[in-house]
Structure formats: C-alpha cells, structure tokens
C-alpha cells in the first residue's frame, strides 16, 4: 500500500490511479479536515479565508500549532489502511513532496509499522535557520521577523517539536530522497540538515539545476523503488 501525503495548499486530489490499477492499495489525503473531492471554488474560499497562511498559525503555542493535528492525522491515515481487510498488514510506504516530503518523514518516524518512505524536497527542515543566519526551510519562519524578543523566544522554543530534522533522526526504514540545488522554497541546506541525520538505508537523487520541482524522469525511479520494496511487478 502507498499513503500519499500532500504538498502545501488547499485543493482537491485525484488519487494515485495508475498505481491502484497496478494492484496497490493507495490512499491520498488532505490535511485540512475537509473532503478532497469538492468544487475548486470551495478550496479557493478556504485558501483566501479561514485557512489563509495556515502554515504560520500559532507557533507561539506548542500545542496549538497547525501541524500538530496534521502530524497526528497522517498516522491516523496509516491506521485506516491497516484496518482494511484487503491490506496485507505489513507493506506500507508513505510518499510526498515539499510539505508532503516533510510529512512522509514525520509519518515514518512516528509510525513503526511503515516500511519505507519517499520524500521529495522536504519542507519544515531547520525551522530556526534564519535566527542563526542561514536559510531555514519552508515556510521560512523568521526570515523577516518582526516579533518582539519575548514572542520570538517562545516561537523558537516551540519549533523543534515540529522540525523535520528531529523526526529524521528517528527514521529506521529505507528511504528514497530527492532535492535540487536551486530550490528557493526548500533550500538544499535545510533539506540536507534532515537528510544527514538519517542513519537508515537511503537513496538520494540530486538534480543540481532543479528548483522546487522534479523532472519527469524522477517519478519512474521513485516508483520503481516503491514497487521493489513492496514486491510488486511493474
């Protein structure tokens, strides 16, 4: 089975249809607690309304940070797959890019049932980077900080609980990772800060000229890695 976790934003999803046709159980989730098959206008209303800039919400309160529910929700998605009679009860890989790349690492770190992960250009790495004079990962907290010293201190105290670097340390399963050296959304230095802490078996694909995107030839490599680890014929 493959659990696909989403990149940033608020939008509908179509599911991993080709992989499902190959016989995999696939589950693609959103993170905002709303159905993922509604009209686009509904998501746009949320994007520019109540969920506008959700990635910056409540960093001054450790237990109210938006991503707390998101991280827990990813594990609950794995629970759902494990509840399915069709699932073999063992072979589950989590996959995502950007925010989803972060969530893939987080989910694999939190849930020992997951057997592997695929993470493209993960976000949420080295969140306090800008405080120390280097580029932090998306969502670029503190890049143009106007917080008072007291609020800044509180926020930088809370971020390690959500920093992907601290989840990457706990990875114990094989992973397929990808980054580009011209990525301004998730700077490669921030991604390396997570990648370098991973001691589990890992494959790294680098496309030096790439920004925050991947070339078409990357997905077949990642897909082949997934199918090999799930013992699925292509």
State where each predicted segment sits:
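The serine-hydrolase catalytic nucleophile loop
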Residues: 8-22
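Gly/Ser-rich "nucleophile elbow"/oxyanion-hole loop immediately N-terminal to the catalytic nucleophile
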Residues: 53-98
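Active-site nucleophile elbow and catalytic-triad environment of alpha/beta-hydrolase enzymes
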Residues: 151-167
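Short beta-strand element of the alpha/beta-hydrolase
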Residues: 1-9
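C-terminal catalytic histidine-bearing segment of alpha/beta-hydrolase fold enzymes
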Residues: 185, 192-234
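Cap/lid segment of the alpha/beta-hydrolase catalytic domain
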Residues: 18-21, 25-72, 129-138
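Short beta-strand/loop motif that positions the catalytic acidic residue
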Residues: 170-171, 177-179, 183
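Hydrolase active-site cap/lid region
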Residues: 101, 105-151, 206, 214-217
